[in-house]
């Protein structure tokens, strides 16, 4: 099954890749490596601090949306072919939280979960949250 077939099976439509917000490139390929610039939540994501203004569930969904944006950017960088991804290497997740919020990994699971759902074992990665 191709990655596009898997996306269809899951009922996932990738968003349009976002464009850089400043003086940088969105992605860079060198050799067989693809680097993707930092990706934040979409405009539809709730605003505020997780644990104060934003629920854990809403933050998880925002992180999931970030994962979909990463996949959309990878698809653009790889000439439309996500099957060229051999393996995801690392996710670095940053979460804006209330001072007493300690469940950062549960938020970033949103991104990790969607990468594994779509890419299978190729989506498993190291992570900092």
Regions found by a protein language model. Give the residues of each.
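Short, polar/acidic, helix-capping and beta-turn segments at strand->helix junctions
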Residues: 1-129
